[in-house]
Every structure is written in C-alpha cells, then in structure tokens.
Design a protein with these regions (language model features):
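PLP-dependent class I/II
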Residues: 1-146
C-alpha cells in the first residue's frame, strides 16, 4: 500500500516516481487524496489498484462506512470540470515553497546552535533534530508564542 497524500506538493527537484508506477505485478495499491491539494475539509480520496484487489477493497470500504459522500464527490467533480487543477497545484506549491523558505530562515536565526533540520523539497513537514540538553517542549512552547 502506497499512501501518497503529499506527492503532488513538490516545489523543488523532480517529482519522485510512485511505487505503483514501478509495479509490474499489480501488487501495489496507490492511495491519493484531494484534501492536501484541493480542499482540506473535503475528506475525499482515490485508489489505483489491480482490478481484483480493487474489488476486495470496495467490499472493505463499504463495510466500514457504506459510501463516500455524493455531495463531496460532486463538489470535486464540478471543481475539476470548471478549473485547472494542475494550475491550482502549481500555485499552492509556490505558496508552500515560500512558507518553507520563511520557516527555514526563522529556524536559522532563532534555534540554538547544534540544531539540524532537513531541507524539504515538497510536502508540508520537515525533520528537526536538537542537541542533547535542549528541551523540545521549551522549543515547542516558544514556537506557539510566535
């Protein structure tokens, strides 16, 4: 199972190939979502899988919640008919790139010596490592104050 909610939110470098794109035996289920690129409150996703796997997945999904909201599906369908989703994704990638650059700048200026972090090329997260003796709770509380 490949869960890829942030795959389209790439703002640097090449888009990484999915495991599904390399799957020659039909073993990978690819899970995507509209909530990260379209509307956070719209809990609507999609699955790409082998036909036999998908039919079993549908049974499991139906036993879990009967069906996905028809209204939510209609909203997503109407949006994709009326607007260019790729252009929208490009726009939000620019926004997230700007936010990433800003947080990296603030971290460089404000965090204590010895802290290290990743430089994300996409998505919404980064990984911060702090030196021994630095309280993660105190850093967290300081961030909340800002």
């Amino acid at each position: 199972m490949e869960d890829n909610p942030y795959g389209e939110l790439r703002f640097e470098g090449e888009i990484q190939p999915s495991l599904k794109s390399m799957d020659t035996k039909g073993l990978v289920m690819f899970l995507g979502t509209f909530s990260k690129v379209f509307c956070p409150g719209l809990r609507l996703g999609w699955v790409a899988a082998d036909k036999d796997v998908l039919s079993e997945f549908i049974k499991i999904k139906q036993s879990a919640d009967l069906h996905t909201s028809n209204f939510d599906q209609g909203v997503a369908d109407a949006y994709m008919d009326a607007y260019d989703l790729d252009a929208h994704v490009a726009k939000i990638c620019d926004l997230y790139r700007h936010r990433r650059d800003l947080i990296l700048q603030v971290m460089e200026e404000e965090l204590p010596a010895g802290c290290t972090w990743t430089h994300p090329e996409g998505g919404l997260f980064l990984w911060l490592s702090m030196p021994e003796g630095v309280s993660a709770r105190k850093v967290f509380n300081k961030c909340i104050e800002m």
